[in-house]
Amino acid sequence: MNAPDINRSILRMHVAAIEAKYPIKIVGLLPRGSVGHVFDDNAIEFLAEKRPGLSLLDLAGAEVDLGDLLGRQVGIVLVSGLKGHEAEELPRLVEPV
């Protein structure tokens, strides 16, 4: 897991708040380095499914808001955006929230 110092119940509470605010479903945690646009060593990376109505602005907002709640940078990868080898491998690496 890439977030050893975050209490799981607090993490689940913050994820639920983001899922209530944005049309997104967080599937789980990804290993550090899975998200290409996140460079902070303390970042947390998630795999998510988009729900109807999710825009790019919503996705960015979910990353920022969840990052604010967790106190560190967050990266979110959408299952629908995975192609080829990544589409097969990343879902296998997900750790439940």
Label every PLM stretch briefly.
Residues M1-F39, K50-V97:
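Catalytic core of pol beta-like nucleotidyltransferases
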Residues E45-A48:
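Short, hydrophobic beta-strand segments
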